[in-house]
A protein has these predicted regions:
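Catalytic core of nucleotide-sugar-dependent glycosyltransferases
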Residues: 1-260
Length: 260
């Protein structure tokens, strides 16, 4: 097997280095230009982006709240989060909230529908976020509150966004610990419960009292992501590992005894 190529680690840091998941235009082909143009038009028409643009113009900051696509809210969790956000607003009034809650039947998610919820004006509820990267890269974004999912954690790291984790299951508890120990954010002590007495002080600390420190730490980890190669570097590692492995009889499906 051939050695893994880590040459991408020698890339030069510059404002043009991107850690975004959007493909980089290398050859300037017409198709790629059309795709980029279509993406730009879609962003201009994105109501969430327009709302975040307005927030920035009004000197407001945004807390993005997304507990993941496989998380279902029960009524107690929902009410506790609403209560926590109301208490947060009293102490940090410049914070707006973008809250993504998937549409699910009442039988599995017994909470008010989008039409019924009657939330305060500083909370915007969406059933779907068309472009997460647009949200995470927006200058109005102050922090990302999530369940500790691997995607949420790494995307926030790559964009230099402070994080607040209320971990829910298995590996998400580990990620909550990573967030706290790395200095990029805070982890709810009473996870997986949504306890206002636990949530509100931490959100105030994250978004107000120690915000600059958490932001600085998050940006330093963004730089580390760039230095490690970013998205392109990650793909290179995976491809090189696959290429360096010899599959017997060109079959990647090993027999069970061999796999163990």
């Amino acid at each position: 097997s051939s050695p893994v190529n880590f040459s991408f680690r020698n890339l030069e840091l510059s404002p043009n280095v991107s850690t975004a998941s959007t493909p980089t235009i290398a050859d300037g082909s017409m198709l790629e230009k059309q795709m980029l143009s279509a993406h730009a038009v879609a962003q201009m028409q994105d109501p969430v982006k327009i709302w975040m643009d307005r927030a920035m113009m009004d000197s407001k900051r945004v807390l993005y709240l997304n507990m993941g696509s496989i998380f279902f809210y029960n009524r107690e969790d929902y009410d506790n989060i609403v209560a926590s956000l109301e208490m947060l607003h009293e102490q940090v009034p410049d914070i707006l909230v973008l809250w993504k809650i998937g549409n699910h039947p009442q039988s599995v998610q017994p909470i008010p529908t989008l039409e019924e919820c009657n939330l305060p004006s500083y909370i915007r509820r969406e059933h779907w976020i068309a472009d997460v990267e647009t949200v995470l890269s927006h200058p109005a974004l102050a922090a990302f509150m999530h369940h500790g999912g691997g995607n949420s954690y790494n995307e926030a790291l790559a964009h230099g966004v402070p994080q607040f984790c209320i971990s829910q299951w298995v590996d998400t508890h580990d990620i909550g610990l990573y967030i706290q120990h790395s200095g990029v954010g805070l982890w709810a002590e009473k996870s997986p419960k949504f306890d206002p007495s636990d949530m509100v002080p931490k959100l105030v600390r994250l978004l107000k009292d120690d915000y600059k420190r958490f932001r600085h730490s998050a940006l330093s980890w963004k730089l580390k992501c760039i230095q490690a190669g970013g998205t392109i570097g990650t793909v290179d590692i995976i491809e090189n590992l696959l290429k360096s492995y010899d599959f017997p009889d060109n079959n990647s499906k090993a027999r069970i005894p061999d796999a163990l």
